[in-house]
Amino acid sequence: MKLLIDFFPIILFFAAFKVWGIYVATAVAIAATVVQIGYIRLKHGKVEPLQWLSLGVIVLFGGATLLAHSETFIKWKPTVLYWLMGGTLLVGQLVFRKNFIQSLMGAQIDLPAPVWRNLNWGWTGFFATMGVLNLWVAYNFDTDTWVNFKLFGGIGLMFAFVIAQALYLSRHVKDEGDAAPKDLQP
């Protein structure tokens, strides 16, 4: 159910685009994200900061798309969101000496500091790359191709990256009885 709630706005955006075009799809995405946040707030009592950020970005860039009647703004939305997330990880690591990936996942998994650092850098690089890739598709292909990439390509690449991260983590996770990860044992 959580996955459906997470993908609710993008699924509706995609469907609306196929039927009515980019401007109606943009309005639908804004409304769906507002409904999504309202549902999460009612159901769980708390909305995560990333969800608020996503709402702010869709309202800002979607609103600009509708007001200016220019699809350029909505095409920039994923890039801005990716770069904000990657930038947050980067600033956290370099400026505040805080690994936000470890802060998010540290209670669920026990890893050595270098592995946490590699995860943080990996996600930072992934978000930066996805932002550039989104712009490349947006400016080199038609809007229909960009929408398909946004749904299928973006989610597919995210899924592949998560699997790669899981494989990387599986080499370093401590077993219940182990004192150290497999690759760090003498």
From Swiss-Prot:
Bilayer topology term: Multi-pass membrane protein
Subcellular location field: Cell inner membrane
Key words, A-Z: Cell inner membrane, Cell membrane, Membrane, Transmembrane, Transmembrane helix
Entry coiled-coil feature ranges: none
An example Gene Ontology CC term for this record: plasma membrane
Major subcellular location class: membrane
Keyword Protein biosynthesis: no
Residue ranges crossing the lipid bilayer per the database entry: 10-30, 47-67, 76-96, 121-141, 149-169
InterPro entries linked to this entry: YciB (IPR006008)
One Pfam family per UniProt: IspA
Keyword Ligase: no
Domain of life: Bacteria
Similarity section: Belongs to the YciB family.
Function description: Plays a role in cell envelope biogenesis, maintenance of cell envelope integrity and membrane homeostasis.
Protein name (Swiss-Prot/TrEMBL): Inner membrane-spanning protein YciB
Organism: Acidovorax sp. (strain JS42)
UniProt gene name: yciB
